[in-house]
Amino acid sequence: MNNATFNCTNINPITHIRGSIIITICVSLIVILIVFGCIAKIFINKNNCTNNVIRVHKRIKCPDCEPFCNKRDDISTPRAGVDIPSFILPGLNLSEGTPN
């Protein structure tokens, strides 16, 4: 008296494949949007940092700005290392230019 049998022979394989393809496309689009969002966030943060450096460089008009800004106003590449302000070591010339 078991009337709750399930017959697997009537499943249409084309419908099953179509559903799998739709799910795969949706998941792929979500992953692509997440990756592009992360990349855009990185570039937005980089631009904010660059704008802050430009503002600080324009605000500080003095010869001792070398630790904070590059001489050539080249802010496209970040500087590595730790900047030491010139007032801490006044007798040491740390500039990247030619010697006097």
UniProtKB/Swiss-Prot annotation:
What are the alphabetically sorted keywords of the record?
Glycoprotein, Hydrogen ion transport, Ion channel, Ion transport, Membrane, Signal-anchor, Transmembrane, Transmembrane helix, Transport, Viral ion channel, Virion
The protein's predominant localisation is virion
Recorded hits in InterPro entries, A to Z, give:
InfluenzaB_glycoprotein_NB (IPR007288)
Task: Please state where this protein is localized.
Answer: Virion membrane
User: Where is the signal peptide, in residue numbers?
Assistant: none
GO BP, one example?
proton transmembrane transport
One MF term in GO for this entry? channel activity
Task: Report the family membership.
Answer: Belongs to the influenza viruses type B glycoprotein NB family.
Q: How does it assemble?
A: Dimer.
Protein name, entry field:
Glycoprotein NB
From what organism does this protein derive?
A: Influenza B virus (strain B/Lee/1940)
Higher taxonomy: Viruses, Riboviria, Orthornavirae, Negarnaviricota, Polyploviricotina
